[in-house]
Amino acid sequence: CMEPDIFQKIVDASEVMTTIGGISSLSQVAGIACLEKCRYWLNGFIKQVQENRDYALERLRRMPVVCCYKPQATFVLYVDISALPMSAERFTKIAREQYKVAVVPGGATFFGPGSEGHIRICLATSHEVLEEGLNRLEQALRDLANDKVNG
């Protein structure tokens, strides 16, 4: 980075404990690209994340037992699954083990007690990967709504 003040802010921010111990790898790569490469990369990335966000919101609105609002500035969706008869942590385990889709649970461990009943979905991926993940998530939710899930 050509600007020492900006570079130091990035270094300082990376030392702050977040969900997994600092700034995510995705955020670090995006920051480097934004600061050292070309603005066109950032514009393309933002466009892709916005398209993925809009697609995911459209899909989620048709799924049972979930609620999700349009975020203003992030690469994740925070989905309310509190209508399910289980914790977010239990749901993410079922989703991962039985439906082979990974989502991050809310809860005191990472996001504070007010985040229980929510899951996070990452939008910073290809449309194809997002579509497949949403297909699997939808199947898990439909099966849970119809009591077709083991465990």
PLM feature spans:
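Conserved core segment of the aminotransferase class I/II
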Residues: 1-50, 57-59, 141
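Surface-exposed helix-capping loop/turn segments at secondary-structure junctions
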Residues: 40, 60-69, 145-149
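A short linear hydrophobic-aromatic micro-motif
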Residues: 21, 64-68, 102-108
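Short hydrophobic/aromatic beta-strand micro-patches
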Residues: 1, 78-80, 122-124
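PLP-dependent enzyme catalytic core of the Aspartate aminotransferase-like
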Residues: 94-103, 109-151
